[in-house]
């Protein structure tokens, strides 16, 4: 994109207004949008609609990437790749129902139970990803990570950041529940910390 110094005055003013109004996509792609409007001979209302819709889509894209970044997902989380032949634990109909996320809207908790290697973490990660795509703030961590965070948040800045992220999450998936030996001193969690989610 051209620098402000080399732009015509009206483009410079539009770009500055877009930045001040926190419309980064419009500020960055103004030339492209103006050229398209001229090519298609858009009306004023069509041009305005184009600007706002593209800004909105870009905002949704950036919001999704931010939620995905902070979700704590492993490398593989695409439920389309789930191998239904390897386990009798869940069938395709049940998977489709889970992916509809009705259980989130109804604030149900899910408990995934099975032997090691049957895909519990993969399913939980995939459902977290489905929730992120649907606009939810979701987070995946192990039970050990959760309790370490709760125990050290007052003395550790990273732990406090994780704690704040957990408290803002609309869906929390807790992995490796049966692998972490609970100590009595760690079991007492304050009421605001109790979240709905998957375990």
Model-predicted segments: where are they?
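Hydrophobic anchor at the beta1->P-loop junction of P-loop NTPases
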Residues: 112
């Amino acid at each position: 994109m051209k620098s402000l110094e080399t732009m015509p005055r009206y483009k410079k003013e539009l770009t500055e207004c877009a930045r001040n109004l926190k419309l980064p996509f419009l500020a960055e792609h103004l030339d492209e949008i103006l050229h398209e409007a001229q090519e298609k001979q858009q009306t004023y209302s069509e041009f305005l609609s184009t600007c706002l819709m593209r800004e909105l889509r870009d905002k949704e894209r950036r919001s999704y990437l931010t939620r995905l970044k902070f979700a704590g997902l492993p490398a593989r989380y695409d439920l389309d790749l789930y191998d239904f032949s390897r386990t009798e634990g869940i069938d395709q109909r049940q998977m489709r129902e889970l992916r509809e996320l009705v259980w989130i809207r109804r604030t149900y908790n899910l408990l995934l139970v099975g032997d090691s290697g049957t895909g519990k973490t993969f399913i939980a990660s995939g459902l977290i990803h489905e929730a992120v795509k649907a606009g939810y703030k979701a987070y995946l961590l192990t039970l050990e990570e959760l309790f370490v965070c709760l125990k050290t948040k007052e003395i550790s800045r990273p732990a406090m950041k994780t704690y704040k992220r957990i408290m803002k999450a609309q869906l929390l998936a807790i992995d490796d529940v049966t692998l972490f030996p609970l100590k009595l001193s760690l079991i007492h969690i304050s009421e605001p910390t109790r979240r709905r989610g998957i375990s």
